Structures are given as structure tokens and as C-alpha cells.
Amino acid sequence: MLENLENLVNQEDQEDQEIKYTPRESKYCPECNGPTTSFGWCVTCETNFMKGRFPYWSSGNKDIDELIRHTQLNSSQTCDYLEWIPFEAFEMVKYIGSGGSSSVYSALWMEGPRLVWDEGLQEWTRTGPIKVALKRLDNSINITSSYVDQIKANHKLL
């Protein structure tokens, strides 16, 4: 009886260690049949999607735009890239405080990030309203390369 119990425990441990894919975590993209990474993220399709959006947004700063585009072209999962969000996309903006050379606000981002996989549409969709923190630079017209480097470092920590 003890032997049967040990066999059952070993079998359950082995089953827990097997990689199991759900349709959402398929190994292959339903669009191009290429390999996917985290939760069905297809690097090829998502890179093409983001490239197609490049002409439709700009931060107004060449260095910031290049940084955002770099993260989008090198993303390996849905929450691994930066995105330019126009100020008009935020509601309920509330001042929190200031320090150094910036001010911090809380706000509601009405669209939210692209984090939800829609099985029917077979594409990533936005979450809807989500609370976020905004940082406003006091001298944002003259963003330095050291500030861009700081953004790069913060992105690597995410």
C-alpha cells in the first residue's frame, strides 16, 4: 500500500512538471504559424503590428521615439515594451507631489495596456480602464540623453 502511495505521488509530481499548453498558450501563432513565446505572443506578428503603428504616433522627441520603437521591436511578451500614450487618453488626473525636476500625478488610462488575449478575434486587446502614475518633467522640451538612459534602465528592471 505504501508503494502504491509513493507511485501515485511520483506520478502527480511528474505530471506537474510537464509543460501543458492551453489554446491561449499555443506554441504556434494562429496567424503565421510561427513560434510563440509567453502566452501566445508571436514576435513576428507583433513586431509587424507595432511597425505598422509607427507613423501614427510621436512623442515629439526623436530620442524618446527611438527608445519606444526599440522596445517594441525587441519585445518578447505582452508587457515587455513601452508605448507612447497621448495625455488626452488619461482621465481623473490628480496631482500627487513633486521633487527634483518633475511632478507626479495619478490618473486613469481609459484604454489600458494590450494584455488580454481575445480567443474569438485571435488578437491582443486592451484591458480597459487602469490606474497609472504619470511623471511630468519640468523642462520636458530639453530632455537629455541621461534622462533617456534612465528610462532605458527602468525599463530593463520591469
Model region roles, listed by residue range:
Residues 1-158:
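Intrinsically disordered, low-complexity regulatory segments of kinases
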